[in-house]
């Protein structure tokens, strides 16, 4: 499979995959994914279709992490490809941009997905304007998703008490060590077991407990009330971390906002290779679909296992950068 790479103007969508599906999926010229009447008998469910074509806007922010980690551009393309090739859901459009999205994309998005080093609206030029535009989207009921470090905020991004719109839009965030009010923890764990925490929630459909070598952030920030999740925030996945002093940490969560919008945050994957983990990938794609107000299929979003090299990462495996020379 080859992912089409084009030099689009900033804020314009990047080309989609040309891969031919083996399950009779067709991409129309309008960009809507259409499917046959039913999926494989082995799955046993009729393919669902969004009531109206929904649009997922994936925004890739800057990243300076070593090859094989974060790989935000490849991760954005991978999520788009997965949503384009869902085996049991159709009627969804996707766009990916690597800059602040143009108004036409913001106006038509059902949900906006961020991946990057720290919360991209604060990292792109004109952060206050970006947040104002995003606020307009949120007031309209648009969903929001942040993946791994895109959940993160610097101390300079937040008020002294930790307030930031992301806390309301998504229900929580990763507080960088520069934050004055709280410090979340970023540490790589050799065996982090991720456990479903809300079995009846639609985002929990079809994925089971899994263990992986990764960097699920812990001590994430959920508000000034003793760092407890707000009543409209649901813990979706937890992990007993750190191993030397374990407590139940929330590593994926969602919110249903008063403006009718939905938010979903997940603090993995750090290592690009972990996109191979089917349960993790399904959890993320379920979350995106749910925030777009699309019915999550009974067994969760079903996709083929991706070939990670297809999405043009710097590296699938982690490559440590040479240490900088020390001069006398």
Where are these predicted regions, by residue range?
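Helical hinge/lid and interdomain linker segments adjacent to catalytic or ligand-binding clefts
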Residues: 58, 67-153
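N-terminal secretory signal peptides
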Residues: 1-24
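Catalytic beta-strand/loop cores that center a nucleophilic Ser/Cys/Thr
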Residues: 180-260
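N-terminal export signals
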Residues: 24-46
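Extracellular ligand-binding/catalytic regions of CAZymes and related secreted enzymes
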Residues: 51-53, 78-81, 242-250, 256-328
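C-terminal segment of N-terminal export signals and the immediately downstream linker at the start
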Residues: 18-19, 41-60, 65
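A glycine-rich, often tryptophan-bearing local segment used as a flexible ligand/cofactor-contacting loop or short
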Residues: 119-205
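Residue-level signal for short, function-critical loop segments
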Residues: 62-63, 150, 269
């Amino acid at each position: 499979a080859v992912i089409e790479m084009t030099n689009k103007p900033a804020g314009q969508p990047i080309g989609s995959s040309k891969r031919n599906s083996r399950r009779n999926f067709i991409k129309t010229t309008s960009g809507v994914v259409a499917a046959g009447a039913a999926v494989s008998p082995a799955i046993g469910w009729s393919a669902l279709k969004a009531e109206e074509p929904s649009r997922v806007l994936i925004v890739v922010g800057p990243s300076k992490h070593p090859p094989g980690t974060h790989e935000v551009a490849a991760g954005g393309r991978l999520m788009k490809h997965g949503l384009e090739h869902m085996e049991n859901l159709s009627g969804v459009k996707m766009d990916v941009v690597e800059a602040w999205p143009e108004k036409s994309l913001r106006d038509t998005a059902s949900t906006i997905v961020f991946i990057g080093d720290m919360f991209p609206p604060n990292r792109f030029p004109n952060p206050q304007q970006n947040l104002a535009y995003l606020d307009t989207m949120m007031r309209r009921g648009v969903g929001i998703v942040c993946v791994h470090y895109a959940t993160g905020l610097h101390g300079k991004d937040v008020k002294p008490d930790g307030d930031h719109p992301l806390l309301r839009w998504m229900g929580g965030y990763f507080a960088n060590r520069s934050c004055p009010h709280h410090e979340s923890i970023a540490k790589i764990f050799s065996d982090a077991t991720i456990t479903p925490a809300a079995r009846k929630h639609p985002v929990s459909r079809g994925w089971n407990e899994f263990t992986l070598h990764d960097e699920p952030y812990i001590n994430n920030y959920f508000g000034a009330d003793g760092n407890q999740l707000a009543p409209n925030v649901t813990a979706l996945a937890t992990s007993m971390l750190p191993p030397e002093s374990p407590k139940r940490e929330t590593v994926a969560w969602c919110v249903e906002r008063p403006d009718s919008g939905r938010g979903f945050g997940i603090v993995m994957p750090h290592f690009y290779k972990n996109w191979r983990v089917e349960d993790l990938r399904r959890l993320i794609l379920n979350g995106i679909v749910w925030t777009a107000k699309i019915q999550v299929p009974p067994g969760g979003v079903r996709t083929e296992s991706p070939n990670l090299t297809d999405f043009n990462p710097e590296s699938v495996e982690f490559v440590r950068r040479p240490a900088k020379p020390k001069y006398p």
